[in-house]
Amino acid sequence: MAPRAYWKGSLKLSLVTCPVVLYPASTSVEKTRFHLINRETGNRLKQQMIDAETGDLVEGDQKGRGYELSKGQYVEIEPEELEAVQIESNHTIDIDSFVPREEIDQRYLNHPYYIAPDGKAAVDAFAVIRDAMKDQDRVALARIVLTHREHVIAIEPMGKGMLGTTLRFPYELRDEAEFFDDIKAPKITKDMVELAGHILQTKAAHFKPSEFKDQYETALKALVKRKASGKPIKLPEPEERSGNVVSLMDALKQSLGKGDKKAAPAPSRRAPAHRRPAKKAHRSAARQRKAG
């Protein structure tokens, strides 16, 4: 059975238009989920809305949406007023520009979607746009309306299809200066940096997501299985922290001595999903945030 499309519409480049479909590239179906239950009965609990001041139960027709102007002061927004500012989808992905891949700052990347042609008649136009981007190593920046909100989406070739990733707006990112300005000047030597470089070489590898292991998820499933079968659960003893103080140079030397993995050759080509933050674009965005 074909996966259900999240969005259907057209991809538009100037006068070239082709029908496309979007599918979410991520899923949380396999994640272990817990529900709140009554310990005495084992029944699932349901949540109710309670007035924070009076403690009274609030029914569905009494609930509204309010924006907090000041502490405890809200302006209520009616549903029809919200609808007035929502953007109706025109079911078109309008490509505004094509940018070099390396200029895209990773911090702006948000939700990924797979983009495929919708029907046989769309394949040729879809392939022309896809292959042109591949040849020039550029990423399309376009606009799309999802759930009544307009988003900027970055579109790039991926195999036979394309990958679209919605981008955050500058106001959604915090300025790194808030966190980095107080970092003091380091007292390190060239030898320390070279030793660290050798350690890096012993751990050099290729990017292989298939080797990622979610140890917490695995442990959760094992815990649930043991608990459901009535087996006792043994809690681990807390680890004692070592009180030994080791100098940075000694730690580097000891780490290098433990390195038993040979350095892997550097990848000949950067993977499409892995992008280096663009300093130029980032500085520009930071200036915009400060100016705002």
From Swiss-Prot:
The keyword DNA-binding applies. Residues 12-196 form the Ku domain. Disulfide bonds: none annotated. Residues 231-292 are annotated as: Disordered. Gene3D superfamilies: 2.40.290.10. Residues 271-292 have a biased composition (Basic residues). GO terms for molecular function: double-stranded DNA binding. Keywords: DNA damage, DNA recombination, DNA repair, DNA-binding. One of its GO terms (biological process) is double-strand break repair via nonhomologous end joining. Belongs to the prokaryotic Ku family. Homodimer. Interacts with LigD. With LigD forms a non-homologous end joining (NHEJ) DNA repair enzyme, which repairs dsDNA breaks with reduced fidelity. Binds linear dsDNA with 5'- and 3'- overhangs but not closed circular dsDNA nor ssDNA. Recruits and stimulates the ligase activity of LigD. This is Non-homologous end joining protein Ku. The gene is ku.
